[in-house]
Amino acid sequence: MKIRILFIILWCFMISNMKAGEICSVSADSAYAIVNVSVCNMRDEGKFTSGMTTQALLGMPVKVLQYTGWYEIQTPDDYTGWVHRLVVTPMSKQRYDEWNRAEKIIVTAHYGFTYERPNEHAQTVSDVVAGNRLKWEGSKGHFY
């Protein structure tokens, strides 16, 4: 059976202006984030050569513990690790709470794609894997 294609417009990535290595205390307004890639590798230290501790999935709400060019984050099941600054979207507590309350789609297929528009020939926005959480934006035909 052909897997139905998911449709969602993903939020824009917020890119930090901070230079790598600069230490920043995390304010209450930026102590939260949402994972914005399908699978996010969490590491022992803030560098790509460091060992991987666990993984987080797209749409997972996390707490930001500190920032040093990489974010140290904590998952809802209390795992901690370091992630590159581009794989999470930092946000205020209010926006974080809104995300948690919003209706979601949970990906159950092993693998799939999100598209820019509800059309199989539209530009691919991202891959998705089982367990990814996307904010419900409505449906059109067999696109969500």
Protein language model features and the residues they cover:
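Bacterial Sec-dependent N-terminal signal peptides
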Residues: 1-28
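Boundary regions of SH3-family modules and the immediately adjacent low-complexity/disordered segments
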Residues: 21-31, 37, 47, 54, ...
